[in-house]
């Protein structure tokens, strides 16, 4: 197994670029929303890496600092904690970040902490302090991006999500979990990852890879108490083999919906995935289909809500539960589906938020007939 500072690990492949695009796009929404209503927000990077890739591409710490610098008008203070256990990577990160901050205009609004340690140690100590004093974390985004599946105890994720304004964005290394699942010498690490013996909880048949992802998400909901979760599949850049899933978990619908929109738009329509070497061909083929086809969503809305009146916001939030049945549609699809139902006489609207009858948003009321 390659060491974390091995040069082969620091080539910025296409799946890494896609992952960082997802992170950056979400932070561009997260910082203004949380920063405007809170005196302090925090970005916690548990596997911060070297700062830059071999080709000069910025790593997650640099991406986060640059986004925060651009959006400084929206917050009073943002804290960054960058954790990296590999000594060579940590030293390089220190140097890269020092150079970056020379051109950062709003560094006075940033509190930056670099920690040479393991993620679980640093996060665990922080959570111990919070729990000891019965405090609550400030709005915090935890980016947990390991190379493998060790060093990321499920109990840490559970404790993070116990604070209502926290979010977890986790690289779940499905390929490695599936490959090493049956090895007796790794049973302890698998149990730590899932917060229980995952092998006993898997169904006896079916797609094991999908079951491994869904089991982790079920733990987030049933054990950690997360209200919402999403996942985005990423394949090897030069093949169609699944490498990992990015899993987002939180307790706030607005954040969930924003991340869902980011993921939807990043992947081929409706797939929530980067498909490796098949990605371009899939995108080309999808141009032959209507991305606004909401037939399935109309059926779902009628089945769930016939005879009821809900706000537009409540409609979109309600279909997120139960989590394993959430449809792969975003706000624009709900708007198109409901307007189509109104035209067909299957629903009526009462404007509350919208200023005209043509609008549909927020607290506008929808009665499903």
Predicted features, each with a name:
Residues 131-140, 147-340, 344, 350, ...:
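Class I S-adenosyl-L-methionine
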């Amino acid at each position: 197994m390659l060491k974390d500072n091995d040069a082969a690990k620091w080539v910025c492949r296409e799946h890494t670029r896609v992952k960082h695009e997802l992170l950056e796009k979400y932070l561009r929404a997260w910082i203004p929303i949380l920063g405007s209503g809170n005196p302090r927000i925090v970005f916690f990077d548990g596997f911060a890496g070297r700062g830059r890739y071999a080709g000069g591409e910025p790593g997650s710490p640099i991406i986060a600092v640059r986004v925060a610098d651009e959006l400084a008008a929206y917050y009073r203070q943002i804290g960054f904690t960058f954790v990296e256990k590999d000594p060579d990577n940590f030293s390089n990160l220190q140097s890269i970040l020092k150079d970056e901050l020379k051109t950062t205009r709003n560094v006075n609004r940033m509190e930056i902490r670099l920690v040479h340690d393991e993620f679980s140690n640093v996060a665990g100590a922080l959570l111990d302090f919070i729990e000891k004093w019965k405090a609550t974390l400030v709005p915090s985004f935890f980016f947990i991006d390991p190379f493998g599946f060790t060093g990321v105890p499920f109990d840490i994720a559970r404790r993070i999500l116990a604070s209502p304004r926290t979010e977890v964005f986790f690289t779940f290394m499905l390929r490695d979990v599936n490959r090493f699942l049956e090895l007796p010498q790794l049973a302890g690490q698998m149990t730590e990852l899932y917060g229980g013996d995952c092998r006993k909880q898997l169904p006896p048949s079916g797609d094991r890879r999908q079951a491994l992802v869904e089991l982790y998400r079920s733990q987030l909901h049933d054990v950690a108490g997360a209200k919402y979760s999403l996942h985005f599949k990423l394949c090897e850049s030069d093949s169609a083999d699944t490498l990992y899933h990015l899993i987002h978990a939180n307790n706030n619908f607005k954040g969930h919906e924003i991340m869902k929109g980011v993921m939807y738009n990043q992947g081929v329509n409706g797939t929530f995935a980067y498909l490796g070497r098949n990605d371009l061909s899939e995108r080309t083929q999808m141009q032959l289909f209507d991305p606004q086809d909401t037939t399935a969503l109309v059926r779902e809305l009628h089945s769930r809500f016939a005879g009821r009146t809900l706000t537009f916001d409540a409609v979109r939030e309600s279909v997120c539960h139960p989590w394993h049945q959430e449809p792969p549609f975003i706000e624009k699809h709900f708007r198109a589906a409901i307007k189509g139902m109104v035209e067909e006489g299957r629903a009526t609207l009462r404007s509350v938020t919208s200023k005209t009858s043509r609008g549909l948003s927020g607290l506008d009321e929808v009665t499903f007939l």
